[in-house]
Amino acid sequence: MKKYFATVFARSQIRRADRFIAHPVETQQKLLSRFLAAAADTAFGREHGFGDIRTYQQYRQRVPLCTYEDLRGYIQRIAEGERDVLWPGRPAYFAKTSGTTSGTKYIPLTREGLACQVRATRDML
């Protein structure tokens, strides 16, 4: 019985991966659009015009590459309890890095992000 369900699950994962492989650009565009729409009403999203971005090229023009230091102020606001700063709502947790390059860093982790990491780990198995 377990083998049957494992086989059904594996086949569904393979079909899903095949769709991504067959249409990588379209898949990435859909994901970018979904993320931009979700974060459009956050402080970071409003400052960078997420609501008006329709293409990857527009995203590259409006959202500069940033380091942790560039985001530190946003992360501080989140740590102080402000909602909707980098992502809607508040994070479930803060991960603490070892700080090998420039001291300890705190990374906000959302429930959605944690669920995505769990799914990715499960899918790899």
In which residue ranges do the predicted regions lie?
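Nucleotide 5′-phosphate-binding alpha/beta core
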Residues: 1-96, 102-125
